[in-house]
Amino acid sequence: MTLLGTALRPAATRVMLLGSGELGKEVAIECQRLGVEVIAVDRYADAPAMHVAHRSHVINMLDGDALRRVVELEKPHYIVPEIEAIATDMLIQLEEEGLNVVPCARATKLTMNREGIRRLAAEELQLPTSTYRFADSKSLFREAVAAIGYPCIVKPVMSSSGKGQTFIRSAEQLAQAWEYAQQGGRAGAGRVIVEGVVKFDFEITLLTVSAVDGVHFCAPVGHRQEDGDYRESWQPQQMSPLALERAQEIARKVVLALGGYGLFGVELFVCGDEVIFSEVSPRPHDTGMVTLISQDLSEFALHVRAFLGLPVGGIRQYGPAASAVILPQLTSQNVTFDNVQNAVGADLQIRLFGKPEIDGSRRLGVVLATSESVVDAIERAKHAAGQVKVQG
C-alpha cells in the first residue's frame, strides 16, 4: 500500500531534487500532479525545476556537509539525484541512516564514475563492452593507448556532456588529449578511461523502469550526438527482434545489479544483431525527452511512479516521434524566444526550459514532433527548432 500526503500539509510527501535542470523540472511537474511537495536544489539560483517547486536551495552539491544540512532542514522522504556531480559518499551515509535515495545510493555512486560502472558491467556482469584501460598519469595514459591501439577515445572517468573527450587517431594527439581530459573532469585533474572504438550501426537509449511490479522497457530511442551532446532523438528505433531481446537482457541485468526503483537510461551500441553496453544513468535521460510526446507515460512520469512505489502496469507508445534541441550560442541574462508560433501546431510541441542565462552554447529548449514515419518526425522537429530565434 502506497500512502501519499498532501503538499504543504503536516503529512506531506516530500521529494528533494538534487539538480534542477530541464529533466528535474519535468520530474517536479510529475510530482506536482500527485500532490507531492517538491524541494529543488542546485548550484545556481532560478534553475528550471525551481520554477515549479515549492521551495528551493542553492548549494555546492559536491560539499557533503552542505548537502547534509539541507537534507536535515527539509527532511525529504525521497532524495532524487538529477545529475552526477553530487557528494555520493554523503548520499550513502544518509541512506544508511534511513533516507530513501533514488534509485539507491550505490547506483548513484557507481554511475558517477565511468570506472565503477564499466567494471560492474564488464567484469562483474560479464556484459559485452568496448575494450578499455584506465590511467591516472601521463605515462600510464600512453601505455593504455598503446595497448588499445588507434583509433581510440579518451574520457575523464568523471565528466558529462562530452567534456574532456578526444577521439585519438595518432600519437601526435596524445599530449593535447591528456591535457583536455584533465580540464574536463568534474572533480578536476585525475583518472581517465581509454576505450577502443566500437563499430556500430546506431546507438540507442533503452529507457528501463525497475518498479514494484517488475522491470519494464520503453521502445528503443535512437539519437544523434554531436560534440558529446544529443541533437535529435527519435522513437522507436528500428532494430531486429534478436537485437532488441539482447538489449533488454543487458538492460535488465544492469538495472537489477544497480538496485532500487526508478527509471534508468541504458545506452547501447547496436551492430546487426549484436549489442554492446556503453553507459547507464540511474535517472531520466536527455534523449528520452521524446517520450513527452511519444508515450502515454513519459520517462519522467515513469520515474516518479516507480520511486514512489506505484506499479507501472504498461507503457503505450503512440508511434513515430522525434525531438530536436534548441541550442543557441550567445551571452545573455535576459533571453527571449521569437517565432515560437512556428514550433507549435498539429502533432508539434515545444518545451522552453527557463534557464536564467547563457554564456556560449547551451540547450534552452526542445521541439517534439510526431508523424507517419520516424524520418519525417525528425525533419519536422529539426525544422521547427530551427525556426525559433533566440535573442538576448
Swiss-Prot record:
Keyword Magnesium applies: yes
A molecular function (GO) term: phosphoribosylglycinamide formyltransferase activity
UniProt keyword annotations, A-Z: ATP-binding, Ligase, Magnesium, Metal-binding, Nucleotide-binding, Purine biosynthesis
UniProt: Mg(2+) binding residues: 267, 279
Biological pathway: Purine metabolism; IMP biosynthesis via de novo pathway; N(2)-formyl-N(1)-(5-phospho-D-ribosyl)glycinamide from N(1)-(5-phospho-D-ribosyl)glycinamide (formate route): step 1/1
Residues annotated as domain ATP-grasp: 119-308
Catalytic activity: N(1)-(5-phospho-beta-D-ribosyl)glycinamide + formate + ATP = N(2)-formyl-N(1)-(5-phospho-beta-D-ribosyl)glycinamide + ADP + phosphate + H(+)
Name of protein: Formate-dependent phosphoribosylglycinamide formyltransferase
Annotated residues for binding of N(1)-(5-phospho-beta-D-ribosyl)glycinamide: 22-23, 82, 286, 355, 362-363
Known EC number: 6.3.1.21
GO CC terms, sorted: cytosol
Chain residues that bind ATP: 114, 155, 160-165, 195-198, 203
Cross-referenced InterPro entries: ATP-grasp, ATP-grasp_carboxylate-amine, ATP_grasp_subdomain_1, PreATP-grasp_dom_sf, PurT, PurT/PurK_preATP-grasp, PurT_C, Rudment_hybrid_motif
Origin superkingdom: Bacteria
Metal-binding among keywords: yes
Function: Involved in the de novo purine biosynthesis. Catalyzes the transfer of formate to 5-phospho-ribosyl-glycinamide (GAR), producing 5-phospho-ribosyl-N-formylglycinamide (FGAR). Formate is provided by PurU via hydrolysis of 10-formyl-tetrahydrofolate.
